[in-house]
Amino acid sequence: MNKILLQCDNLCKRYQEGSVQTDVLLNVSFSVGEGEMMAIVGSSGSGKSTLLHLLGGLDTPTSGDVIFNGQPMSKLSSAAKAELRNQKLGFIYQFHHLLPDFTALENVAMPLLIGKKKPAEINSCALEMLKAVGLEHRANHRPSELSGGERQRVAIARALVNNPRLVLADEPTGNLDARNADSIFQLLGELNRLQGTAFLVVTHDLQLAKRMSRQLEMRDGRLTAELSLMGAE
């Protein structure tokens, strides 16, 4: 088994509005190995997106902890979490969240700029990542000049430009048609093989989940046993 990269220990998340308490996550525990491609399947409102926010250090659990590469996130300062997100984690969302006034190349370069890389390194790394997703010829185009599939490829390039250890993906093919969704999954698999990047994808798409190496199911804020998707349509 691969070395554990990320581990969740009894994660709970509760929101409170006045006297009303809502438990969104209940004692969630699992781990992701280095280079693993894993899916968490669940319907809308099951707690999947909340879980990703906790894993990425974007929110704080009510109880429990997230341990990344042996380091508990509860012991990290806000600045240290931000550095971790910039250098070790990548994020892909259902909507691409590209900056509309920037070119594809400039969007991909943004994490490198935040990480204060040298200008020459920023340009070459961003262009190389666009090449890896098959879009070097679109480097100087803005998001409005790209198709939906191309915009999502740019978002993936941006997530991977810092060579993160783990990419957290929230419904990465949710806004794409079947052909583009298949193309995006093939791209994720190729990048996993070439770079050894681990992927944790949360989705309601059983066909996407079926193509990952391991699947878990989330229902009402709880992770169930590993999901069998044999014969899923």
Swiss-Prot record:
It is a peripheral membrane protein. Keywords: ATP-binding, Cell inner membrane, Cell membrane, Membrane, Nucleotide-binding, Translocase, Transport. Its EC number is 7.6.2.-. SUPFAM superfamilies: P-loop containing nucleoside triphosphate hydrolases. It is an enzyme of class 7 (translocase). ATP binds at G42, S43, S44, G45, S46, G47, K48, S49. GO terms for biological process: lipoprotein localization to outer membrane; protein localization to outer membrane. Residues 6-233 form the ABC transporter domain. It holds the Pfam family ABC_tran. The complex is composed of two ATP-binding proteins (LolD) and two transmembrane proteins (LolC and LolE). PANTHER family: IMPORT ATP-BINDING PROTEIN, LIPOPROTEIN-RELEASING SYSTEM ATP-BINDING PROTEIN LOLD. Belongs to the ABC transporter superfamily. Lipoprotein translocase (TC 3.A.1.125) family. This is Lipoprotein-releasing system ATP-binding protein LolD. The gene is lolD.
